[in-house]
Regions:
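A polyanion-binding, active-site-adjacent surface
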Residues: 3-229
């Protein structure tokens, strides 16, 4: 496909029908059938979860993969889970979201200057995609980066996302040596882009204080500075 004719809509259409990874297809569909008790009466999405947000975004927020009972249930990344609760509250405080919660596709949430995606678009068992599954999914991120013409900053939520961002940028011809190491508020200049590290807003990090609200807000304030917005 020619990148010049590509669009976020076309990428989304390709993502939601993807069945390239048999293990992930089996897992996401089994979770959607069996369901956890608290969501037993809800219809699960059970498909790959596309990126979403402002098509004129200067900032991409990049996660690992949808949560099995979060994005895999609701059809939107970081929607309907504790990580999303923490993330969107911060995006609202820092002026990137019109509301502090993200619970469903039709909840009225809108993003400003931000686009959210994940390295892997399907929920993986134990939140651990294999290297092969990562590599099969990475072209979707490469296409999104190419289409987002105003993009300047990629906020990588965790080391897996940091690695995925660097791999995607390398596929577009932007290679940095030696390879930058992940850290909270670490910055890597990669061609015309900056990759900005942030601890993932997982319960493991937020409940233990490894990532606080102030720390996450500081990341998005810095992303705005780097993007020149």
């Amino acid at each position: 496909m020619s990148v010049g004719r590509d669009s976020l809509e076309r990428i989304r259409d390709d993502v939601v029908v993807c069945r390239l990874c048999p293990r992930l297809v089996e897992w996401r569909e089994r979770v959607a059938r069996e369901k956890v008790a608290r969501f037993a009466n809800q219809e699960y999405w059970g498909r790959p979860v596309p990126g979403w947000g402002d098509p004129d975004a200067a900032i991409v927020i990049l996660g690992l993969a949808p949560a099995a009972d979060g994005g895999n249930r609701t059809g939107r990344i970081f929607t309907g889970d504790r990580s999303g609760d923490f993330l969107f509250a911060s995006l609202h405080r820092t002026g990137f979201a019109n509301q502090p919660t993200s619970v469903s596709l039709d909840d009225g949430l809108r993003l400003r200057d931000v686009y959210i995606a994940a390295v892997n678009r399907c929920a993986p068992p134990a939140n651990k995609p294999t290297p092969e599954e990562r590599d099969r999914c990475l072209p979707y991120l490469v296409r999104e980066i190419a289409v987002l013409r105003d993009l300047r900053v990629i906020v990588a939520l965790g080391a897996f996302a940091w690695d995925g961002a660097l791999r995607a940028l390398a596929a577009l011809g932007h290679v940095v040596k030696p390879r930058p190491r992940f850290g909270h508020l670490a910055e890597a200049s990669v061609g015309p882009f900056t990759v900005l590290g942030c601890f993932h807003p997982s319960q493991q990090n937020t409940f233990t204080g490894k990532l606080t609200t102030q720390m996450l807000d500081a990341v998005f304030d810095r992303a705005r500075e780097l993007a020149g917005r």
